[in-house]
Swiss-Prot record:
Necessary for efficient RNA polymerase transcription elongation past template-encoded arresting sites. The arresting sites in DNA have the property of trapping a certain fraction of elongating RNA polymerases that pass through, resulting in locked ternary complexes. Cleavage of the nascent transcript by cleavage factors such as GreA or GreB allows the resumption of elongation from the new 3'terminus. GreA releases sequences of 2 to 3 nucleotides. Belongs to the GreA/GreB family. This is Transcription elongation factor GreA. GO terms for molecular function: DNA binding; RNA polymerase binding. It holds the Pfam family GreA_GreB_N. Keywords: Coiled coil, DNA-binding, Transcription, Transcription regulation. GO terms for biological process: DNA-templated transcription elongation; regulation of DNA-templated transcription elongation. Gene3D superfamilies: Transcription elongation factor, GreA/GreB, C-terminal domain, Transcription elongation factor, GreA/GreB, N-terminal domain. The keyword Transcription regulation applies. Residues 50-76 form a coiled coil.
């Protein structure tokens, strides 16, 4: 995330990401010790273990920075309790351009919410589609602009709290 934006997270997702961050930070001395051990093995130009440990450290530090930025800019809330309104944490069903046969069901949330089963697509509330649907009521139509510049009409068929 290069630009600062608020990310909606449930308390559960926030806690899970915070635990991951804490574990990565606690692991820093282990990686540093591994690098030191590998450095003592001799010539660094031909030391695969040293380079692998440095690569692992770089990946770990990048993930730490990503999690810190995400958590610092997170808005923590609970999944919506009500049905019928498209909110972050809602599973919505929509149809496009007045074609009731062209439906799609997805979750309005962030990928950090941890949907790992792959059965449910996730659209961010900050995306053009997610943003257009926010606070829409069942039966309401909205429009949004896709990256190609076309304007698409979307109608909310249903909105239910995610039961993940």
């Amino acid at each position: 995330m290069t630009d600062t934006q608020v990310t909606w997270l449930t308390q559960e997702a926030f806690d899970r990401l915070k635990a991951e961050l804490d574990q990565l930070i606690a692991n820093r001395p282990v990686i540093a010790a591994e690098i030191n051990d590998r450095r003592e093995e001799g010539d660094l130009r031909e030391n695969g273990g040293y380079h692998a440990a440095r690569e692992e450290q770089g990946q770990q530090e990048a993930r730490i920075r990503q999690l810190q930025e995400l958590l610092n800019n997170a808005k923590v809330g609970e999944a919506p309790k009500q049905s019928g309104v498209a909110l972050p944490g809602s599973v919505v069903k929509v149809y496009y351009d007045d074609d009731e046969n062209d439906t799609e069901t997805f979750l309005i949330a962030t990928r950090q919410e941890g949907i790992s089963d792959g059965k449910l697509e996730v659209y961010s509330p900050n995306s053009p589609l997610g943003g257009a649907l926010l606070d829409a009521k069942v039966g309401e139509s909205r429009t949004y602009t896709v990256p190609s510049g076309n304007v698409v009409k979307v109608t909310l068929v249903s909105a239910e709290p995610y039961q993940g």
